[in-house]
């Protein structure tokens, strides 16, 4: 649904190129006639990029891959994921907080999944003064894919 919704706005879908939610987004974009990009990582247990990727780039190092995600993204939609997903998201949040990159819309799909993380951000780092309200105020947590896509596209022509 996410990839197809982005394709309908003529916006490329860029994922890690793997299975699961990444594959679903790439497939949706590809089948809807949009651009489907996969930035995969060389890991001992990872397969080749999923078959729905139109442009595949493979990276040896996570930091290079994260730089490419940050550099070539005007917004991000995060689906539930593991440590790799968290690493990519916190990298982008850190770059925006420290003004090493411009702020871009970050949207988190899945209130049940991401809600606890946002509760923790407010109760620990924010309440202890390690982050500021503006560091998290613009972040959206939603279950609505159309709302997620609209928010991620805010500020760009789509």
Predicted stretch roles:
Residues 140-158:
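Glycine-rich phosphate/pyrophosphate-binding loop and the adjoining helix
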Residues 23, 47, 151:
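Active-site-proximal flexible loops/turns
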Residues 42-135, 141, 147-148:
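Conserved phosphate- and dinucleotide-binding cores of soluble alpha/beta proteins
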Residues 1-39:
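Glycine-rich beta-alpha loop segments
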